[in-house]
């Protein structure tokens, strides 16, 4: 696999609710996180500040557990997911299709859309 697998918001939510250990990574910017966030633990790694965390990614993420990546619409998260696979050797990487916007529509309308 050289690109992340797409996962719909409802599917990801169901897997999390079932207790599956999936690491959630949000690559959006601070101001986006302030506008809308998931109501569960998320590792915040904004792409614009990659230089601050890139050399620590192995300490921040467990490569033995699946990683689901999200952004606003699914593009930046897909790029980060490709990097995890191609450059860091992660094998179980999911990209939240439609990003947090899809989560707002499919799972939790209390999460603001922007």
Specify the residue positions occupied by each region the protein language model found:
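Rhodanese-like catalytic fold shared by cysteine-dependent sulfurtransferases
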Residues: 1-22, 30-66, 75-114
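Short, surface-exposed ligand- or partner-binding patches at beta-edge/loop junctions that are enriched
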Residues: 70
């Amino acid at each position: 696999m050289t690109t992340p697998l797409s996962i719909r918001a409802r599917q990801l939510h169901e897997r999390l609710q079932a207790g599956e250990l999936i690491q959630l990574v949000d690559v959006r910017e601070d101001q986006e996180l302030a506008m809308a966030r998931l109501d569960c633990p998320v590792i915040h790694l904004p792409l614009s500040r990659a230089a601050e965390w890139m050399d620590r990614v192995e300490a921040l993420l467990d490569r033995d557990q699946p990683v689901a990546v999200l952004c606003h619409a699914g593009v930046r998260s897909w790029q980060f997911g490709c990097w995890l696979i191609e450059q860091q050797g992660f094998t179980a990487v999911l990209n939240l299709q439609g990003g947090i916007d899809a989560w707002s529509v499919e799972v939790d309308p209390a999460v603001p859309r922007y």
